[in-house]
Structure formats: structure tokens, C-alpha cells
Amino acid sequence: AISRSNEAKALGIPMGAPAFKYEKIFRENDVQVFSSNFPLYGDMSSRVMSILSKFTPNIEIYSIDEAFLKFEGFENYDLESYCEEIKDKVLKWTGIPVSIGIAPTKALAKIANRIAKKFPNQTKGVYSINSDEKRIKALKWLNTGDVWGIGFRHAKRLKNIKVNTAYNFINLEDGWVRKNMSVVGLRLKKELEGKSVLDLEEVRSPKKAIATTRSFEGTITDYEKIKERISTFSICCAEKLRAQSSNCNSIYIFVRSNKFQKNKKQYRNGILMTIPFSTNSNMVISKYAIEGLKKIFKKGINYKKAGAIVMGLDSSKNYQLNMFEKENPKHQILMKTLDFITKKEGTGKIKLGSQDLKRIWKMKQTKLSSRYTTELKEIIALK
């Protein structure tokens, strides 16, 4: 499970749980299970973000289902009523319920949002931390591990020194926080104290790493089949690099067996391959990915998952050159042509020799819901 409703959480179904382990609970409680439907999610996310942008010009799209809105110049507005209007509009126009948290800082807004979501009957989906009293009450309520920006490692360290709530955290000395959690942790502390230090990122920064990973429909033992997938994953990363005008100078390849098949031999390994020059070429990135696979592939293993992650990203318009090795300049022209054809004709029309020319690689989506808003043949029919 990568996403769960409140009802599913109440049944004790944890995040990341394999569906086959909970089939009995599914049957007994009429739990509906759906495969990932990224075209639908992406389209609905765009619609929600478009609606939000009509209520303020200052918006940071934080993830596919989260955004920060800045209400600068709204001093004369009743923000709680205004946000109720936003919530109602999103629900009416998209059918998607949202929760809204209002606060003077991003970190406190995340906590307010958590309260709005946790107590829908009391908050009606909107909660404002608009006083010091409410801020302190919220911080005493929230566990340290649930604070936005405090990861598992820091949460464990804080718990060891009896820092169990966000309120305990803000009472730590600034020097200790900076020393043990860096300047990032100190900024978070200031945010929880009500001092805004994290600006809105209205222009999304390019990603610092790009990954393409997949679990296979079954298990695979054949090297050539794994190679085809690694080649395809690395090329997908290269396409994403070009989409954000970036190059990479290294690629990490990994393979792993099925951890749920305890009776089978277990194996997992990965390798970082350094590319001697910055590139976003399908041919170069795929070549180094396959070289990496050769080093870590082991015969006799039932492989269930593999992936490629490109790292060392920089701008393709301004990058460091290597005095001794450089990319074939024809690759840039070829990639532009390839991207043009892909945009016009669709993905998979032109492939490298290391890819299966007949195979269209798809995720396992046996319980896929309809793509109502992006596929004409799947649109809702009214009778």
C-alpha cells in the first residue's frame, strides 16, 4: 500500500504493506484495492493546483497532493472563511476533499493541516494556528517523529534524550540543534517558534537526482531480460534529465530479489558508475548502466526489482567540461531529434538495440481504475 484511506488505516493496514499479506482483511471488510493510476493522479493534481492558484498569486506546489499558499496582502480577510471557500470550491469542481492548515510559517502550517485532517468533525477541514496559545498546544500534541523535516534518524536521537514532542524540541538550545541537526534543523526550530525562515519556492528547483525503479510482474532470472529493463530505466532517466535541461555525471544501478519469498535465495546489490563527462544522452547513460549491471548481476537469483538513479546533476546549458574525455557532439542533435519524434508520435517508437523492440514495458496494474480525465474511451458514460 502506498496510499490508504482513514478507514484502511483503522483496520491496521500499514504503509508499504504487500497486498497479498492482507487479503483476508480485504475480503472480511470489503476493502477496495486499486493499482497506481499516475495519469489520473497527475491530471487531477493539476486541476486542484489550478483552482488554488485562483485564490492567491503566491503558490508553491510542494508535491502531487500538497501546496503552500502565501496570503500576502490579505490582512483584512477572514482567512478561515476564505480557506473554507477554497476547500468547498476544490470539492465542488473536482470531487476531491482537501484539508487546509493556516499558520504564520510553513512548518506550523503543516501541523495545522495535520490537525484539520485528524479532527475533521471539529475543524470542518480548516484549522488556524493564529495565536501563541494554539501554537504551544499544537506543539505539545505533536510527536517529534511527526514533525515535518525531522526524519527517522533524528527522531530516534531526540527520543533517546527524552525529546518526545515538538514542544520539547523547541526548548532545546540552538547550539545543540545546529551541531546535531545542522542549519536545516535550526531553521525548522525557528519555524516552530513562529519565525518564518523558509520562503515559498514558487519556481520549482530542478531535481538533484532522478530515479526510475520498478517491481517486475513476476521474478526474472535471465540476464538479457534484466539488461533490457535496466537499459529502459536508464533511458527513462535520460529523458527526464532532458525535460528539466540537466546532465548527470554518474548512475547508480541496483537489483534485488523478492524479499517475501523466504524459501528462495536472497540477494540485493547496487553499484555507482561514474561517467567521465556530463551527459543526458540515451546511448551514454544506457552504456554505463549496462556496464554496472554486469558487475553486480548474479546467476541463479529470482530478481523482483531493479532500478536506475542518475546523480551529479547540473545544467545542460552550463556544465563543467572534461579536458581528456568529452561527449560526441552528434549525440545532442540526435537527442533533440529523438525528443521531437517522441513528443509527436508517442513513447517507444525509437529504441536502442539493448531494448526489446517489440516489448512495451508497463507496470503491473491488474486493479487499474478508469482514467476518466485523460483517456477518451474511458470517460464516464451517462445514460
Which positions does each model-derived feature cover?
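Catalytic palm subdomain of template-directed nucleic-acid polymerases
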Residues: 69-87, 162
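Generic non-transmembrane alpha-helical segments
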Residues: 47, 51-55, 85-94, 157, ...
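Long, highly charged, low-complexity intrinsically disordered interaction regions
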Residues: 79-143
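Residues that scaffold, gate, or flank divalent-cation-dependent active/transport sites
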Residues: 1-64, 68, 192
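DNA-contacting surface of Y-family translesion DNA polymerases
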Residues: 154-302
